[in-house]
Amino acid sequence: MTVLTIYREDLPEQPLTQTTDAAEIAALLAQQGLRFERWPAQVELADDATPEQILAAYATEVDRVKTEGGYITVDAVSLRPDHPDRAALRQKFLAEHIHSEDEVRFFVAGQGLFSLHLGDHVYALLCTQNDWISVPAGTRHWFDMGSQPYFTALRFFNNPRRLGRSVYRQRHRQSVPAPALNSGSERDNFILSLALAC
């Protein structure tokens, strides 16, 4: 289930807002210049579906987003719990960073947690299957895929070489309990890291 939780950066243990309503999530994110949509499931895809099969299944939505946003390249990526570099990849994306182009993702399967550092607040969005999010260039954020990552996502790029520049900055973090990342079966709970003031 998709969940948006909003915290003050200095009081992560006291959520100001928490909602699972897709329309409310979209409205709250739109107030901050972000876009969120729920796309209808087109077909049931196998866990080992190829990037070509995934792109074909969502061709209508992909074409619409490419046209609206001027995106040139779209690809599909998957990460599973047995990936040998999952711990290193998780640590890399837990560092707060910005991109020189929009970060646009659609979750075909599984889930992941985007934490968006907007002013003195953090918007923690647990994205699940059929969620689409567009994070504007220059937005401070980090991504937690959990200790046992399971997701497949479409990625949209303005740059045909998919080389959007990332700037990573380490920030102090405080661990706060958060919803468990799972893929339909029970998974171990993970700890959501929220940025605190430097």
Curated annotation (Swiss-Prot):
Site (Important to generate the dianion): 105
InterPro entries: ARD (IPR004313), ARD_bac (IPR023956), RmlC-like_jellyroll (IPR014710), RmlC_Cupin_sf (IPR011051)
This protein's UniProt keywords: Amino-acid biosynthesis, Dioxygenase, Iron, Metal-binding, Methionine biosynthesis, Nickel, Oxidoreductase
Site entry (May play a role in metal incorporation in vivo), positions: 96
Cofactor mode of binding and number, as noted: Binds 1 Fe(2+) cation per monomer.
EC number annotated for this UniProt entry: 1.13.11.54, 1.13.11.53
Coiled-coil residue spans: none
Pathway in which this enzyme or protein is active: Amino-acid biosynthesis; L-methionine biosynthesis via salvage pathway; L-methionine from S-methyl-5-thio-alpha-D-ribose 1-phosphate: step 5/6
Reactions catalysed: 1,2-dihydroxy-5-(methylsulfanyl)pent-1-en-3-one + O2 = 3-(methylsulfanyl)propanoate + CO + formate + 2 H(+); 1,2-dihydroxy-5-(methylsulfanyl)pent-1-en-3-one + O2 = 4-methylsulfanyl-2-oxobutanoate + formate + 2 H(+)
Cofactor(s) listed in the protein's UniProt record: Fe(2+); Ni(2+)
Residues at the site labelled May play a role in transmitting local conformational changes: 102
GO MF terms held by the record: acireductone dioxygenase (Ni2+-requiring) activity; acireductone dioxygenase [iron(II)-requiring] activity; iron ion binding; nickel cation binding
GO BP, one annotated term: L-methionine salvage from methylthioadenosine
Binding residue positions for Ni(2+): 97, 99, 103, 141
Role description: Catalyzes 2 different reactions between oxygen and the acireductone 1,2-dihydroxy-3-keto-5-methylthiopentene (DHK-MTPene) depending upon the metal bound in the active site. Fe-containing acireductone dioxygenase (Fe-ARD) produces formate and 2-keto-4-methylthiobutyrate (KMTB), the alpha-ketoacid precursor of methionine in the methionine recycle pathway. Ni-containing acireductone dioxygenase (Ni-ARD) produces methylthiopropionate, carbon monoxide and formate, and does not lie on the methionine recycle pathway.
PANTHER family attached to this UniProt entry: ACIREDUCTONE DIOXYGENASE (PTHR23418:SF0)
UniProt family annotation: Belongs to the acireductone dioxygenase (ARD) family.
Subunit text: Monomer.
Protein name per Swiss-Prot or TrEMBL: Acireductone dioxygenase
